[in-house]
Regions:
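Membrane-water interface segments that mark the loop-to-transmembrane alpha-helix transition
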Residues: 16-42
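Helix-loop junctions and terminal segments of transmembrane helices
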Residues: 1-18, 90
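Hydrophobic residues within alpha-helical transmembrane segments
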Residues: 33-36, 70-73, 101-102, 131
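Interfacial segments at transmembrane-helix termini and the short loops linking adjacent helices
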Residues: 20-24, 46-76
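Membrane-interface helix-loop junctions in multi-pass transport and translocation proteins
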Residues: 49, 53-54, 63-66, 95, ...
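Membrane-interface junctions at transmembrane-helix termini in multi-pass inner-membrane proteins
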Residues: 69, 73-100
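Interhelical loop/hinge segments that connect adjacent transmembrane helices in multipass membrane
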Residues: 18-22, 146-155
Length: 155
C-alpha cells in the first residue's frame, strides 16, 4: 500500500533501533489504512462502478458483484500478508521465500485444475491464488508479526 511504502524507511530505522512500540504502531496503522481503503473502495466500486463506467461511455462492465467482492477479499488478504512480510524483511529475515515459491506452484496447479478440469472460468482465476495463499501465507506472516509485537509489548 502507499502508506506502508511511504513509511518503509521509518520501519527500517525502528527495526535497527529495536523500537517495537513504533513498529507495532506502524503495523496497526498500515493494516488499518489497508483494510479501510479496501472496504471503502470496494463498496464504492460494487455500488457505483458500473454507473461510473457508463458515465464515461465505456463499453465494459465490472465483474458481477459476488465475483468482485471475492476478488477484493483475495487481494486484501494478499496485501495484508505482504505488509506483514515487509515488516519481517525489515529485520533482515526472509522466511517467506520458499513458501512464496510453493504458493506460486500451488497457484499454477490450481489454475490448471480449476480451468481445465472443473471449467470454472473466471471463478477459477480468482479462487486459485486465493486458495493457494490461504493455506499458509495469508495467516502465517501476519500472525508471526502480531505474536512478535504482543510478546515484546508484554515482556
Amino acid at each position: 500500500t502507499v502508506y506502508y511504502q511511504s513509511i518503509t524507511p521509518k520501519i527500517a530505522q525502528s527495526r535497527a533501533n529495536k523500537d517495537i512500540e513504533a513498529l507495532r504502531r506502524y503495523f496497526i496503522h498500515s493494516i488499518g489504512i489497508l483494510v479501510g481503503t479496501f472496504v471503502v473502495g470496494g463498496v464504492v466500486i460494487a455500488l457505483f462502478g458500473n454507473w461510473g463506467l457508463n458515465l464515461i461511455g465505456s463499453e465494459t462492465q465490472f465483474l458481477p458483484t459476488t465475483m468482485l467482492c471475492v476478488m477484493l477479499l483475495v487481494n486484501l488478504l494478499e496485501n495484508n500478508h505482504a505488509t506483514a512480510a515487509g515488516f519481517i524483511s525489515a529485520d533482515n529475515r526472509i522466511p517467506f521465500f520458499i513458501p512464496s515459491l510453493l504458493s506460486g506452484v500451488g497457484t499454477i496447479i490450481l489454475l490448471w485444475f480449476f480451468l481445465s478440469v472443473l471449467h470454472w472460468g473466471i471463478w477459477g482465476m480468482i479462487l486459485a491464488p486465493g486458495f493457494a495463499q490461504l493455506v499458509y501465507q495469508n495467516w502465517k506472516w501476519p500472525s508471526m508479526i502480531i505474536r512478535e509485537f504482543i510478546i515484546h509489548t508484554h515482556c
